[in-house]
Amino acid sequence: ALVYHDISQEQLLLLITQAVQAELQKRSRQVPVGISVRHIHLTRDDVDKLFGYGYQLTPKKALSQPGQFACEECLDIIGPKGELKHVRILGPERSATQIELAQTDCRNIGIKAPVRSSGDTKGTPGVTLRGPNGTLTVPEGVMIADRHIHMTPAQAAAFGLADGDRVQVK
């Protein structure tokens, strides 16, 4: 049994929603599909810089990947040739700040970003992020996310899949 201390009502609701979604998906061979080509993952340090020390991101909506959520908070992304306004932050916080954009977004702001797997930020271009507490220039982290599917280990096992497998989606 899991024991949670100091958990907010929003976090509890998020955990319950994710548990119900996981149970429903166990009963189905269908996998829900969502597309999210424009979002930001932040480190704890970068949340502090952009929103103020100790600020806690606010969960807005649970995502299909357990423990992941879209936040109420958004940032502006500033590149050499333009900017993207109100880009959603995804939580929870990460070990490295990462900005996932569509190829069109990159072209519009003047960035040449590579197609990469999530987390593979080494050698990628950087941008400036603007939040309510000021701006922050991140030296790397902009990428076009490679196509992928988020599944729980139980879902993957039900389909006979392992991490890194290639699939066709119909």
Locations of the language-model features?
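Short, low-complexity, charged amphipathic interaction modules
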Residues: 1-27
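Short beta-strand-centered segments at strand-helix junctions
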Residues: 32-80, 85-132, 137-168
